[in-house]
């Protein structure tokens, strides 16, 4: 493929998750004294699904499972950083996705063969790229210890409402 940026734009795929985590943590450190917004988009489990060496073989589900473990580790490390900085209590953290799961995206990593009886979309029909519920219904987890008691809800959430919701929380119009 075509890539701009010369050597500065090149990295080892195995190091992407760690690099993005380090950048996210540094942003929080640099902005801890004032309100901030950070969009921290996890690369995993998108292709190339190449886990860091310390995650290879850990899931028993091949590279796809290993990078999902790596993504989980990254989220945990980021939350620990918020705790370490004393920011966790009053920081809103949302973990969500832009689409449902996909197993067979043409990337030959044994995802289909190793899935066993696990159903990534649960009982829903469809996957990413379909308009069925399995393709468009996504997880939405919110953590805000100062204001939201931990629990489970089956309430409908539309990501398009997030801008208006955050503006309202901040007393702003958009």
Residues covered by each model-derived region:
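Loop/turn elements at helix/coil->beta-strand transitions in domains of secreted/extracellular proteins
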Residues: 31-38, 87-93, 137-138
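Active-site His/acidic residue clusters
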Residues: 22-67, 102-104, 108-111
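Solvent-exposed loop/turn segments at secondary-structure junctions
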Residues: 43-47, 99-102, 131, 146-148
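Short glycine/proline- and acidic residue-enriched helix-loop micro-motifs
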Residues: 1-12
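Amphipathic, non-transmembrane alpha-helical secondary structure
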Residues: 18-29, 76, 80
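Soluble non-cytosolic domains of exported or imported proteins
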Residues: 11-19, 62-69, 153-160
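Substrate-binding rim/cap in mid-to-C-terminal beta-strand-loop elements of soluble/periplasmic
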Residues: 2-4, 76-85, 113-174
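Metal-dependent active-site segment of extracytoplasmic phospho-/sulfohydrolases and closely related
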Residues: 70-108
């Amino acid at each position: 493929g075509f890539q701009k940026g010369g050597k500065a734009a090149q990295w080892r795929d195995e190091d992407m998750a760690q690099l993005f985590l380090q950048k996210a943590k540094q942003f929080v450190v640099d902005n801890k004294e004032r309100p901030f917004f950070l969009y921290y988009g996890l690369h995993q489990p998108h292709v190339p699904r190449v886990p860091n060496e310390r995650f290879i073989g850990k899931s028993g589900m091949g590279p796809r499972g290993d990078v999902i473990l790596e993504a989980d580790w990254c989220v945990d490390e980021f939350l620990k950083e918020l705790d370490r900085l004393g920011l966790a209590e009053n920081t809103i953290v949302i973990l969500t996705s832009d689409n449902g799961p996909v197993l067979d995206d043409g990337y030959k990593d044994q995802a289909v063969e190793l899935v066993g009886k696990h159903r990534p979309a649960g009982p829903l029909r469809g996957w990413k790229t379909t308009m069925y519920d399995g393709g468009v219904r996504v997880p939405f987890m919110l953590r805000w210890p100062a204001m939201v008691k931990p629990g489970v809800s089956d309430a409908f959430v539309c990501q398009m409402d997030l801008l208006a919701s955050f503006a309202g929380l901040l007393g702003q119009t958009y």
